């Protein structure tokens, strides 16, 4: 089989589970060596081992607090020490919290920006010279609430909107430096984080988590919830030579749940 990413090196933040792990797995299936980053060393080690076993591609990892500058710098340094190269950056770290706005503490907004937004900005900047040298690509995992605000997801919506805006500006820089930049807007996707959201809403509404899931599918007119692999398939395509003319674009993977036309 012709593996379209053979020889490429990819850093995937949030790579120990969920969408990040699915992206790392699909990248490795296409021949890329992957470097996973998140805060939990045990999950990272397990994820890395699974990828190696299933794909026979090299997989390494680094545990760090990506909310802070030192964690991002350590991750970038560890990546370069291990592979001495970076072709692909997937910023997938960061699960922001939903909630009732008047009851949400300031720390939840600050934490959301620190992990999801600032880590993407910092790692993009730190690795930009390497990505420029290799005509690489950046894919940011954003989210539909960046374009469709919700009173129940104000923190995530604000963080995602900022990341989407940054992504477009970064794409303009990428035109100058030959770095492809795109971003993806997942809809409701089956992950541990989504299950936590369903359980929280269930407690608030005195329902079962599966009832909240059914209501979500029905209210958005979906056939089903998304799977992490749905997002990962698009991410891998956007990293491939076949997608090189797709640049500076946000694409939804939400089963048609977006209400707007863009």
Model-derived segments and their meaning:
Residues 100-113, 216:
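Substrate-binding pocket helix/loop in short-chain dehydrogenase/reductase
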Residues 129, 172-173, 244:
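Alpha-helical segment proximal to the catalytic Tyr-Lys
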Residues 175, 180, 246-248:
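Short, small/polar-rich loop/turn modules that mediate ligand/substrate recognition or access, typified
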Residues 30-47:
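Conserved glycine-rich Rossmann-like NAD(P)H-binding loop of the short-chain dehydrogenase/reductase
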Residues 137-163, 167-176, 188-189:
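Catalytic loop of short-chain dehydrogenase/reductase
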Residues 9, 16-18:
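Conserved glycine-rich cofactor-binding loop
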Residues 6, 148, 236, 247-262:
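Short C-terminal tail/terminal secondary-structure segment
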